[in-house]
Amino acid sequence: MSDMPYVSTTLSLASVLAEPARREPDAIALVQGEQRLTYAETWQRARRTAAQLVADGVQPGDRVALLAPNVIEFVTSYYGILAAGGVVVPIPTLLQGREAAYLIDTAEASHLMYHPAVAAAATKAAGMTGVPTHDITTYGTDAEPLTTFVTREPLDPAVIFFTSGTTGRPKGAILTHLNLVMNATVSAFDGNGVPPGTIALGCLPLFHVFGQSVSLNAGFRHTATLVLQPRFDAREALEIMNREGVTMICAVPTMYIQLLAAVAENPDIPVPQLEDAVSGGASLPVAVLERFEATFSTKIHEGYGLSETSPSITSNQEQLGVEAGSVGHSLWGIDIAIADVTVPDHIEFVPAGERGEVIVRGHAVFAGYWNNEAATREVLQDSWFRTGDIGIQDESGRLRIVDRTKDLVIRGGYNVYPREVEEALMRHEGVDQVAVIGVPDEQYGEEIMAVIVPSEGARLDGDEIIAWSRERLGSHKYPRRVEIVGELPLGPSMKVLKRELRTQYSTGE
């Protein structure tokens, strides 16, 4: 074996666009308003961008930051960076200049590509970091396209996704070409798949791993059409879905809640005829799932994943059985298990049916955090990735997510899982959205608090909510404090920012 020559295996995420452009060049890849691009046209634009990046000195492995909403130029820039051999560093569009600068500095990015809609943040970030900037609406438009993409190896970094920073400053999760090509392939062809002829709504932010991997890459892997919505608006989404004949939507729970509200508020707009819906990014309340399925006459297949797992690792799959309230079974080539959360330094499994920390291994697990070996060692143990989520796995392998370990509330010595309380409160007819948190309490250590956004036209009373909850939840679980608010704080991917609520209500602000 030692005498065998080393043969390099090549793989690039850019092939997710290059291959359909070669096989079905005239198929429609992207729609944005009146614009329509075929796969061949999209790939040509990406290769022009790649050629300009190479001319501007980008070398294989160089990080290139990308700050843009869901527009066609995001997609062509994304695959252009990959085609040049670069590593994409997506920057959330909701960040301010200083926040964007931190990500650019941390990733050691050599260039910043931006859309004019976020020029102010880009200009400030560039001023603080010194990186050259490029307007993606004009960059490379006159360049001679590269013939093909620069080859990379499977374990080379492809994208660095920054986590939401729930435990401090954001960390850059390194996803390799193998991670993301496999995740796109498994999402497109296994589980429930992406059927040929799919027209998908691109409403998930493409700077987020869910939008990139499940909407964009998985869709392109099966030559789907992606209809881009630059910024999510529920009423506009209904109109787009009807106009373009959208058959599939991937969304986070907040979006499903807003779509239901938009249907109720706009009876003049027909309910779109969807064939499939996918939910991820956060736990979907069963009450919302049931209402959406009844209203839109389609199933929601809820799945589970994280930035560090590329992201998809489980899904409710028809051939394995769909169950509301669960996130289904592991996807092809991925192992899921439950570990003892009280043993943080190594992996100890717990029996089926017992609560513990969800752990993952397989092709989806990331390569580590960029320039942060200590944080990497904390989560990668004995070939497993520790997710930080509490779950239960039954004998068949079906997984239920109970909550984040960091969201657990300990009231008077009893563990209370906020998701269980939220599921109960979402059954109240006057509740549109709810976040349950723990706040400091002198007697019990922590007290249960529900922060509620009422349904349109509902007049909620905190005492009434407490009394209603008391009849449906154990004495240690029902909220003793209720706040009625106009909206919940949302992060760039539209997840509820519970850390902000804890800070606000723990300090009495």
State where each predicted segment sits.
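Conserved AMP-binding/adenylate-forming core of the ANL superfamily
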Residues: 7-10, 18, 26-71, 75-79, ...
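Conserved pre-ATP/AMP-binding loop-to-beta segment of ANL
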Residues: 10, 25-26, 144-162, 168-169, ...
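Structural core segment of the AMP-binding/adenylate-forming
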Residues: 55-56, 83-152, 456-458
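AMP-binding/adenylate-forming catalytic core of the ANL superfamily
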Residues: 95, 112-114, 249, 362, ...
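Conserved AMP-binding/adenylation subdomain of ANL enzymes
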Residues: 181-199, 207-248, 262-263
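Gly/Ser/Thr-rich phosphate-binding loop
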Residues: 238, 243-251, 261-322, 335
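Conserved ATP/PPi-binding loop(s) of AMP-dependent carboxylate-activating enzymes
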Residues: 329-333, 344-378, 416
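Conserved beta-loop-beta connector loops within the AMP-binding
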Residues: 337-359, 395-396, 458-462, 497
